[in-house]
């Protein structure tokens, strides 16, 4: 239509004529059947306008013509060949289509709907979509068929329609989305009888709805002026129709209007809009909330379009949706006072989307994070920073290990002694230091070495030899504890990271000490072998001596010299036990053997004490009754060595009883020498004085021994013991030494025998 300055007469109710050309522009890709069907209606409407023009020859220009429903009904039911005249008006209406291009409306597309009512419905529903209030939209769509001359008369009819529309407008919102899903090319001709339309217009109720119609008309005019729309309004009043018929027609009109844009929207958006419409119908009180939801839906819908409309069109489109809701509330409540308030709200809300739209591309989603910022902050709150006790680096949750009320890295949780990796089930701790269980038992439980854990001087330092070198080595080992403690306040004594260094220094000290003392390798381990094993022989004694040197000096060094002698005695006693059979066989010759062993110190420690157990009795017999014994031996010279041995045994045993006194007296004298501290020279003089009566017999005795030594000792494999045995004075001197040594441990020897 031509663009004309705004005139309130335009708001009466203008023609519903949307030209076929306009429809073809809007629905380029759709079938031409829509245009053909609509052109049929246009012909009927045009004829009705012509009749009205005849009745009112001085009427306003052609685009203000209006027709009554009765005439339209007749023309629709009985189409007359007036298409030529109707098409003459198409250029005029094409200008109307060009003016309303702001709102891409596929309006009224496939409504073969019955009569004017169907056309009116088709054009009312698009308007909530594309701009300004429903009245304004409707008026802008159909500007021509009304005659403003009959403004008041038409107003009454349109009031009826508005009243009916107000009741049914909520219902019209529901099928909004379902009809969108239908195929656009589907065309249906509705069988709604026009009698009902006629009845609706011919009924009264003019006074009842007049005030409401006036208010809505004025509000629509204001809204339309804001949107630069000079179109007139055609109010639809199909409220008295059955809801099913009205809804179906409404759906078809809505579908045709939204074809250009809704084809690009998703089903979800349309369903959301449908639910919003349902909620609007249910509670007018929730009007404000509904406006917000519809506004957000509109934002989202527009953002999903491939080619969004211009800012003016978008704002008009949003305003249209809001205006529809306000109009619904106004009509349903039929309260005139609410209209101005709602209009002001609509204006403010229509102005708002112009600015927030570019700012919030996701109007609905952006509002959600704002509503719950506190929850998200709590969820993602960073944990407190923790540092590892050992390496002093940050510990993150995935590598955190809490043990002994301290925080470690899993890889740093190691034994402070052997540096083996530990777990919560394999560690033991003492005052902040972590140990593996074997070393904890070895270092503390077996030795009672708890002082080491408390930072005191370690027992190993006390056990080691107290030399200056060791003390200098021991002192530097301690300062790291004091120097490193400030770095880790969580640990009581010293940081676990440095315990390995202490252990290494102690091991280095111990190894150097071992090298100086020729310690065997076993001494590194903290083992105690006490008392020494009794089964070891001569080779075992050397090993025991090595162990004694290598192990810690305990008991103190003052007692070491005392402990050596008992060990020698034990070794002698063990060897005597082993040679018990030899002692019995060689008893006749033990006097010489005892003197020889005392005089000659063999490298072995066992030789001087081989016959110690019975040498004392034989020596006493030698001094007390040596002559008689030797004479008997000479008489038995011719006998075999085995027989002599047996006889000698029996005789020696028989003679031991009467001669015990001599033996005891000699022993007392020798003990007196020891007690008085007499030197070896005095002992020798005393022995010579004591043995002087026996000297005349000595040559014979020695000769006897020389003759029999070769036989007796060779048979017993003792040649080495017989060589150089009788050397006179030397033998006697060393025999006293042997006696002194023997008398010291006399009681033990007596028990062994």
Swiss-Prot record:
Highly expressed in the small intestine, including the duodenum, jejunum, and ileum. Low expression in the liver and very low expressed in the heart, spleen, lung, brain, and pancreas. Isoform Alpha is highly expressed in embryos from day 7-11 and in adult spleen and lung. Isoform Beta expression is highest in adult kidney, testis, lung and liver, intermediate in heart, brain, spleen, skeletal muscle and low in embryos. Residues 386-446 form the LIM zinc-binding domain. The modification N-acetylmethionine is found at residue 1. Residues 278-291, 342-351, 363-375 have a biased composition (Polar residues). Phosphorylation of the C-terminal region by MAPK1/MAPK3 reduces its association with F-actin and contributes to actin filament reorganization and enhances cell motility. Ubiquitinated by the ECS(RAB40B) complex leading to its degradation. The keyword Cytoplasm applies. It is found in: Cytoplasm; Cell junction, Focal adhesion; Cytoplasm, Cytoskeleton; Cytoplasm, Cytoskeleton, Stress fiber. One of its GO terms (molecular function) is actin filament binding. A motif (Required for interaction with NPC1L1) lies at residues 164-166. Residues 491-511 are annotated as: Required for interaction with MYO5B. Residues 46-56, 143-152, 167-177, 292-305, 512-525, 554-565, 630-666 have a biased composition (Basic and acidic residues). Disruption phenotype: Deficient mice display reduced dietary cholesterol absorption. The keyword Electron transport does not apply. CDD domains: LIM_Eplin_alpha_beta. It comes from the Eukaryota. GO terms for cellular component: actin cytoskeleton; actin filament; brush border; brush border membrane; cleavage furrow; cytosol; focal adhesion; ruffle. Residues 598-609 have a biased composition (Low complexity). Residues 46-66, 82-186, 276-326, 341-379, 467-493, 505-669, 682-703 are annotated as: Disordered. The modification N6-succinyllysine is found at residue 437. InterPro entries: EPLIN_Lim_dom, Znf_LIM. Contains at least 2 actin-binding domains, one on each side of the LIM domain. Both domains bind actin monomers and filaments. The C-terminal domain binds filaments more efficiently than the N-terminus. Actin-binding protein involved in actin cytoskeleton regulation and dynamics. Increases the number and size of actin stress fibers and inhibits membrane ruffling. Inhibits actin filament depolymerization. Bundles actin filaments, delays filament nucleation and reduces formation of branched filaments. Acts as a negative regulator of primary cilium formation. Plays a role in cholesterol homeostasis. Influences plasma cholesterol levels through regulation of intestinal cholesterol absorption. Interacts with NPC1L1; bridges NPC1L1 with MYO5B. Interacts with MYO5B; bridges MYO5B with NPC1L1. Interacts with PXN; this complex stabilizes actin dynamics. Binds to G-actin and F-actin. Interacts with LUZP1 (via C-terminus); both proteins restrict ciliation and may work together to regulate this process. Binds RAB40B (GTP-bound); interaction influences LIMA1 subcellular localization in lamellipodia during cell migration. This is LIM domain and actin-binding protein 1. It comes from Mus musculus (Mouse).
């Amino acid at each position: 239509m031509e663009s004309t300055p705004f005139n309130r007469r335009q708001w009466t109710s203008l023609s519903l004529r949307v030209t076929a050309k306009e429809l073809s522009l809007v629905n380029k890709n759709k079938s031409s059947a829509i245009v053909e069907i609509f052109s049929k209606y246009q012909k009927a409407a045009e004829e009705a306008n012509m009749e009205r023009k005849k009745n009112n020859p001085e009427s306003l220009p052609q685009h203000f013509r209006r027709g009554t429903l009765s005439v339209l009904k007749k023309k629709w039911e009985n189409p007359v060949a007036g298409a030529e005249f109707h098409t003459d008006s198409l250029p005029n209406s094409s200008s109307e289509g060009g003016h309303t291009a702001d709102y891409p409306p596929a309006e009224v597309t496939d409504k073969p709907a019955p009569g004017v009512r169907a056309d009116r419905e088709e054009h009312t529903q698009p308007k909530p979509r594309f701009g300004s209030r429903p009245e304004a939209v409707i008026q802008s769509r159909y500007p021509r068929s009304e005659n403003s001359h009959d403004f008041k008369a038409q107003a009454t009819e349109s009031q009826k329609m508005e009243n009916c529309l107000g009741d049914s407008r909520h219902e019209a919102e529901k099928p909004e989305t379902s009809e969108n899903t239908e195929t656009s090319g589907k065309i249906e001709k509705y069988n709604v009888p026009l009698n009902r339309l006629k009845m609706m217009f011919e009924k009264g109720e003019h006074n009842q709805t007049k005030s409401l119609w006036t208010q809505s008309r004025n509000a629509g005019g204001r809204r339309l002026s804001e949107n630069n729309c000079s179109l007139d309004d055609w109010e639809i009043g199909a409220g008295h129709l059955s809801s099913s018929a009205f809804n179906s027609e409404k759906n078809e009109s809505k579908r045709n209007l939204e074809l250009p844009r809704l084809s690009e929207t998703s089903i979800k958006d349309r369903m959301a809009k449908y639910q919003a419409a349902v909620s609007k119908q249910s509670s007018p009180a929730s009007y404000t909330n509904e406006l917000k939801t519809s506004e957000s839906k509109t934002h989202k819908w527009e953002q999903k379009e491939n080619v969004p409309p211009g800012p003016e069109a978008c704002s008009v489109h949003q305003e249209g949706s809001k205006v529809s809701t306000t109009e619904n509330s106004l009509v349903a409540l039929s309260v005139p006072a609410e209209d101005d308030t709602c209009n002001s709200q609509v204006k403010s809300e229509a102005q708002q989307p112009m600015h927030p739209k570019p700012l919030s591309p996701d109007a609905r989603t952006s509002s959600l994070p704002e509503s719950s910022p506190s929850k998200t902050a709590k969820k993602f709150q960073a944990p407190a920073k923790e540092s590892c006790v050992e390496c002093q680096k940050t510990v993150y949750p995935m590598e955190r290990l809490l043990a002994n009320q301290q925080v470690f890295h899993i890889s740093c949780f190691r034994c402070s002694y052997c540096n083996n990796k530990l777990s919560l089930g394999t560690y033991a701790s003492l005052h902040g230091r972590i140990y593996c269980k074997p070393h904890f038992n070895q270092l503390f439980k077996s030795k009672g070495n708890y002082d080491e854990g408390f930072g005191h001087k370690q027992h190993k330092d006390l056990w080691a030899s107290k030399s200056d070198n060791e003390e200098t080595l021991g002192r530097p080992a301690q300062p790291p504890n004091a120097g490193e403690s400030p770095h880790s306040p969580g640990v009581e004594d010293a940081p676990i990271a440095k315990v390995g260094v202490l252990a290494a220094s102690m091991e280095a000290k111990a190894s150097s000490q071992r090298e100086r003392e020729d310690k065997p390798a076993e001494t590194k381990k903290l083992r105690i072998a006490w008392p020494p094993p009794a089964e070891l022989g001569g080779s075992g004694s050397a090993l025991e001596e090595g162990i004694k040197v290598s192990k810690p000096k305990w008991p103190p060094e003052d007692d070491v010299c005392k402990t050596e002698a008992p060990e020698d005695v034990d070794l002698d006693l063990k060897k005597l036990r082993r040679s018990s059979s030899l002692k019995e066989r060689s008893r006749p010759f033990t006097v010489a053997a005892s003197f020889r062993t005392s005089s000659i110190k063999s490298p072995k420690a066992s030789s001087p004490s081989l016959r110690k157990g019975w040498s004392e009795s034989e020596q006493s017999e030698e001094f007390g009754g040596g002559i008689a014994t030797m004479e008997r031996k000479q008489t038995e010279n011719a006998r075999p060595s085995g027989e002599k041995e047996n006889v000698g045994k029996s005789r020696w045993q028989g003679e031991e009883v009467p001669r015990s006194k001599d033996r005891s007296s000699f022993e007392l004298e020798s003990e007196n020498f020891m007690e008085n501290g007499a030197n070896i020279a005095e002992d020798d003089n005393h022995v010579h004085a004591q043995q002087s009566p026996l000297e005349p017999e000595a040559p014979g005795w020695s000769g006897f021994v020389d003759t029999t030594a070769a036989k007796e000792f060779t048979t017993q494999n003792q040649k080495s013991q017989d060589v150089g045995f009788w050397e006179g004075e030397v033998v006697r001197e060393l025999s006293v030494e042997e006696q002194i040594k023997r008398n010291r441990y006399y009681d033990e020897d007596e028990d062994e025998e």
